[in-house]
Amino acid sequence: MFNRVFTRSFASSLRAAASKAAAPPPVRLFGVEGTYATALYQAAAKNSSIDAAFQSLQKVESTVKKNPKLGHLLLNPALSLKDRNSVIDAIVETHKNLDGYVVNLLKVLSENNRLGCFEKIASDFGVLNDAHNGLLKGTVTSAEPLDPKSFKRIEKALSASKLVGQGKSLKLENVVKPEIKGGLIVELGDKTVDLSISTKIQKLNKVLEDSI
């Protein structure tokens, strides 16, 4: 049986995040999953248990990935509340030392039939945890793979820019998307700089359409 006091406590942290009453997270996240991840981060931060929450999320995520049947159950929106609670009980029983805030998160997701959001929430929390530890992950999207020299030059320039910030380490990844046609799209945390040719074409088309 879930402890509803703890569940309501975690739900309160969600409302605090939504009202921006709590301390701001190191990176802004969006969407339902981002809201849950931010609420978990802020709740854990109050008790200096961010790392414990991150480790617990990884344990649950690993358990789900190793058990396809369990993963299927989590993604099944038709599952009854009783069955969802049973799934959570099984996960908690497997990891008896899970962080309390993560357990409460699972309970809230179960009650709101949003267990299917867990994987993205865990991923979003990872972004917050990295930023908390001074590591900023980013992507530079190009139409073709960047050669090592160009990639290093871009990485060096971004590391020294205000987009990264002083005292932070940048971990950059090159993502290839031929559909952008050319140019670059840089994404660092919650910031995006779109210098792709496809976007420039879209803007030009809009100007032409508006002028007709």
UniProtKB/Swiss-Prot annotation:
It holds the Pfam family OSCP. Disulfide bonds: none annotated. It comes from the Eukaryota. GO terms for cellular component: mitochondrial inner membrane; mitochondrion; proton-transporting ATP synthase complex. PANTHER family: ATP SYNTHASE DELTA CHAIN. InterPro entries: ATP_synth_OSCP/delta_N_sf, ATPase_OSCP/d_CS, ATPase_OSCP/dsu. Belongs to the ATPase delta chain family. The gene is ATP5. Keywords: ATP synthesis, Hydrogen ion transport, Ion transport, Membrane, Mitochondrion, Mitochondrion inner membrane, Transit peptide, Transport. This is ATP synthase subunit 5, mitochondrial. Its main location: mitochondrion. One of its GO terms (molecular function) is proton-transporting ATP synthase activity, rotational mechanism.
